[in-house]
A protein has these predicted regions:
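Short alpha-helical
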Residues: 34, 102, 130-131, 186-187
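Short, acidic loop-to-helix structural element flanking the phosphoryl-transfer center
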Residues: 64, 68-72, 84-123, 133, ...
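A metal-dependent, Asp-based hydrolase signature
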Residues: 33, 41, 45-93
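Alpha-helical elements of Rossmann-like donor-binding domains used by nucleotide-donor carbohydrate transfer enzymes
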Residues: 22-23, 38, 73-77, 93, ...
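Active-site neighborhood of HAD-like aspartate-dependent phosphohydrolases
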Residues: 1-44
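Substrate-recognition "cap/lid" segment bordering the active-site pocket of phosphatases
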Residues: 108, 122, 128-179, 189
């Protein structure tokens, strides 16, 4: 079958999760790269633990927390692990920057070309809808994305099969008509 929709992961694929390093370096000199890497690693670890700890639930994980909350918890863990001060003002600056991560420079042109081909475009993300909406708007991509899909309604993170099933619930097409794009190998594998 022909591809009818191109669905992108958000964090790490459309939005550079490591762009937070610049602000982190300003706030914590010499620690920006460590903060960016550890923060992202812990964020992903939390999503996996939550989904894997309750794999047979029919109504999502009882341990589910919105991605924004996990992002904040991951930052707190990271700062504690690196023995850095968790001063509220600095934490809020980092969190606000995370809500407006730098998009990769080629995104807009690529999305415009996909739209010009008549294909449906979407994001499927662990991110909460408000996080995704902020990031998409900040990046100027709201006119080139047809759908922004969050896993929040099912209370399971990617790589649960149910999370990828949200695409067909939102866009009435067959799974083999979807091209899923992610910079994360675990995510691409989960979508297969």
């Amino acid at each position: 079958m022909a591809i009818k929709a191109v669905v992108f992961d958000a964090y790490g694929t459309l939005f550079d999760v490591y762009s937070i390093q610049v602000l982190a370096e300003d706030l914590y000199p010499g620690k920006g790269a460590d903060i960016a890497v550890k923060w992202r690693d812990k964020q992903i670890e939390y999503t996996r633990l939550i989904t894997q700890s309750d794999p047979h639930s029919t109504s999502g994980s009882q341990y589910f927390r919105p991605f924004w909350e996990l992002t904040r918890l991951s930052l707190a863990y990271t700062l504690d692990r690196l023995k850095l001060n968790r001063e509220a003002g600095q934490v809020e600056k980092l969190m606000q920057q995370y809500a407006h991560l730098t998009p990769f420079p080629e995104n807009l042109a690529v999305l415009q070309k996909i739209k010009a081909l008549g294909l449906t475009t979407a994001i499927l993300s662990n991110g909460s809808l408000d996080m995704l909406t902020s990031a998409v708007k900040s990046a100027g991509m709201e006119d080139v994305l047809d759908h922004v899909i969050s896993v929040d309604p099912i209370r399971l993170f990617k790589t649960s099969p149910e999370s990828y099933g949200l695409v067909q619930q939102t866009i009435p097409i067959n799974k083999d008509e979807v091209l899923f794009v992610s910079s994360n190998a675990w995510d691409a594998l989960g979508a297969t």
